[in-house]
Amino acid sequence: MSTISVVIPTRNDAQPLAVCLEALARQSRRADEVIVVDNGSTDNTAEVCAAAGVRRIAVELPGIAAATARGFDEAESEIIARLDTDSVPPADWLERVEAILDRAGPLTAVSGPGEFYGGTRFGRWLGGNVWIPGYRWAVGLLLGHPPLFGSNFALRAGAWEKIRGRVHRGWPPVHDDLDMSYQIPPEVSVLWEPALRVGVSARPFDSWHAAGRRLSMAWTTFAVEFRSEPPLRRRRRRGRWNRTHRR
């Protein structure tokens, strides 16, 4: 068994945060620590955290990348799990996370898909049939391993130590999960578990503006990553390491 911290970055999303925290309170395997990273909320996020009895950390540096990294830095457990504010994990989510990562070893991460709720029927269809599969396969092909999906992933603390100094904390328009995925070194294995699912809000797909914003952040993230290491060079480096160490 391992200890588990759950990190939830948030900003002005008190209502879905309360639902997420209620879902965590119903886990068959309770978290050892829940950290809500408040990135400048002006609503009643602080009151929601106090009522749930979870730790709230205020972060002034704007952007989800800064908030997530701070939460991971503060986590004190052997496994660090990540949810979005509107994620709704099923009751056995942490139990599954612990079992997978305890089997997988000390330098591992695991991610899974989302089941979209709310929003429009088209938005739910778009998220479940285009966005998640496209992200999984297109970004996975680019990386040479599965990507992390920010609404639903976890990693061992040792894996975070490998990338914490490399992530782009000071770039507000960067997708933190995509950035972390790109910074994962060859010695860290990433697993994709289709059965490890959480509820995810379909609201980002309710309008072309919201969907376009997500795509814009993705392109910005790719531009930042490619300047530091082109994808082909990254894949070759990972391939060389795998040939040497995973025979």
Residues covered by each model-derived region:
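Glycine-rich, basic loop-to-helix element that forms the pyrophosphate-binding segment
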Residues: 59-75
